[in-house]
Amino acid sequence: MREQLDQIRREAAEALCAVDTMEALQDWRVRILGKKGVLTGILRGLGALPAEERPLMGALVNEVRAELEFKLEEKSRELKAREKEARLSGESIDITLPGRVQPVGGKHPLTLVIDEIKQIFLGMGYEIAEGPEVELDYYNFEALNLPQDHPARDMQDSFYITSDILLRTHTSPVQIRAMERIRPQLPVKVICPGRVFRRDDDATHSPMFHQVEGLVVDKGITFGDLRGTLLTFARQMFGPDREIRLRPSFFPFTEPSAEVDISCVICGGGGCRVCKGSGWLEILGSGMVHPRVLEYGGYNPQEVTGFAFGMGVERIAMLKYGIDDMRLLYENDMRFLAQF
């Protein structure tokens, strides 16, 4: 059996040298090392040997198997390298061809509008202030001159977590925090972008939406400063021909207060279906900061005045891009979002 094993080793090695394809190498492996291969047959025949010879012959068979498996791996690497070299030598690459342009994503329309609003007010010397979305009742209501019995404090309209902690219903609390941080220095000149939460859900309202509010506090601030600021914003956001109109209104944290309209972005003020024939579209609320709010912020209303304004980003985006249903902004439909 030893002579037979030596012959198998020699013939298998010679046959392996003649192999020149991966298919032929696989055939060689099955014939020599496979379950029905030559070496397996030798192992099965060990039972016919005397008991004292079996361990020695078994060790010799395993030695031959290990040697042939090593040569098999070497041959496999050699053939793979040869095939790769042949494939590369047969291919040609035209380096003058243009590269493949990878598709790139785009910003969400709300992000585009928020970024544009930020740039407009940064250009006017404002800084960006931020605050927590989970807010204390004190900052969300009390410090903004909203009394305990105000409808906005109804738990049916706001998302309360505990009796004195809720999801903020506007970004106005950031104005109080900004005044507390900056006092007693002047001026205070900030915008406060962020998410807010209310119990609304229809074509023009969402339980979560975005606001940008602004605050200016300094000596000698007038309503004229407010109007000039908002006119500048409207013309930079909607075009140089836009006009604004201020209508008397009421907000607990400003006095006097005004709703702000712009001349219709569709008809230019002539009257159309979008503006319902009025020529005007409402965009935000504003007013002079209430003296009590100044006091809560740590300023003396006898020495300083200020103005504030607040806008819904979704409203601005709908007007700017002609979107008629707010819910489109949150449905993640790529056919819609890819337009921006």
UniProtKB/Swiss-Prot annotation:
A molecular-function term among this protein's GO annotations: phenylalanine-tRNA ligase activity
GO process annotations (BP): phenylalanyl-tRNA aminoacylation
Cofactor: Mg(2+)
Reactions the enzyme catalyzes: tRNA(Phe) + L-phenylalanine + ATP = L-phenylalanyl-tRNA(Phe) + AMP + diphosphate + H(+)
Protein species of origin: Heliobacterium modesticaldum (strain ATCC 51547 / Ice1)
InterPro entries: aa-tRNA-synth_II, aa-tRNA-synth_II/BPL/LPL, Phe-tRNA-synth_IIc_asu, Phe-tRNA_ligase_II_N, Phe_tRNA_ligase_alpha1_bac, Phenylalanyl-tRNA_Synthase, tRNA-bd_arm
Subcellular location(s) of the protein: Cytoplasm
Binding of Mg(2+), residues: E255
Cofactor note: Binds 2 magnesium ions per tetramer.
Family: Belongs to the class-II aminoacyl-tRNA synthetase family. Phe-tRNA synthetase alpha subunit type 1 subfamily.
Enzyme Commission no: 6.1.1.20
Record HAMAP family: Phe_tRNA_synth_alpha1
Keywords: Aminoacyl-tRNA synthetase, ATP-binding, Cytoplasm, Ligase, Magnesium, Metal-binding, Nucleotide-binding, Protein biosynthesis
Record text on subunit structure and interactions: Tetramer of two alpha and two beta subunits.
GO cellular component: cytoplasm
Protein name (Swiss-Prot/TrEMBL): Phenylalanine--tRNA ligase alpha subunit
Chief location of this protein within or outside the cell: cytoplasm
Domain of life from the UniProt record: Bacteria
